[in-house]
Swiss-Prot record:
Spermidine binds at residues 64, 88, 158-161. One of its GO terms (biological process) is spermidine biosynthetic process. The keyword Cytoplasm applies. It is an enzyme of class 2 (transferase). The gene is speE. This is Polyamine aminopropyltransferase. Keywords: Cytoplasm, Polyamine biosynthesis, Spermidine biosynthesis, Transferase. S-methyl-5'-thioadenosine binds at residues 33, 108, 140-141, 165. One of its GO terms (molecular function) is spermidine synthase activity. Residues 9-238 form the PABS domain. GO terms for cellular component: cytosol. The lineage of its organism: Bacteria, Pseudomonadati, Pseudomonadota, Gammaproteobacteria, Enterobacterales. It comes from Shigella dysenteriae serotype 1 (strain Sd197). It holds the Pfam family Spermine_synth. PROSITE patterns: PABS_1, PABS_2. Belongs to the spermidine/spermine synthase family.
Amino acid sequence: MAEKKQWHETLHDQFGQYFAVDNVLYHEKTDHQDLIIFENAAFGRVMALDGVVQTTERDEFIYHEMMTHVPLLAHGHAKHVLIIGGGDGAMLREVTRHKNVESITMVEIDAGVVSFCRQYLPNHNAGSYDDLRFKLVIDDGVNFVNQTSQTFDVIISDCTDPIGPGESLFTSAFYEGCKRCLNPGGIFVAQNGVCFLQQEEAIDSHRKLSHYFSDVGFYQAAIPTYYGGIMTFAWATDNDALRHLSTEIIQARFLASGLKCRYYNPAVHTAAFALPQYLQDALAPQPS
């Protein structure tokens, strides 16, 4: 039997993960990124950008449920949602499940990501691109949040790691723009990497976000193909009560929403804000 080709992730220099490649479905360099989608027997279809896994069919639900339902149910009455990135459509899929949301704007820098994901990762968007509340904007995320006249109740930054095109979505200019177009009491969330291996990202995001929001923190989830421990999600708002809502309040909102999830539930919601001590220590104010 011929040995299967292997694809090795290049996120870290000293160690990493690999996938057996059963079939390459798509591989092309766009103006912005090197995109590949291949099939793997364990994780289904896998998409990688610039040598780093972005999503797999097997475990994407964890990431997208936590990035979406935590801020939307904590907010309680979000009407207008902005997604930065998210070209695979799975974040949009989860937002559309909230029937009280009236408009969903998605800003994606690369139209190529959207078009090939619609073709090669159809389970991710699950038809959500056809939702009448949805509007796609092809633009740089930093430019959009600093120029738009729209305002939003929840902003979800589905960014890549802070290298290459994704680097701008970890800058003060981006965070300031998000604060600018966020309604009072609104919530901003963003993926912030695996904190055991990318702790400096969390520290840097916390420091920058604290210039613009009065309540800044993180919540977490364990996602198998984002290896190295828990993944952290940045959380920023000017309403500090939203991070400390009781499980009972979240439970009531969850039941009213009619959501059926595979990972998220109200107990997971409240527990997700409990962070390991090493991260708490890293984020604590340093003595002068």
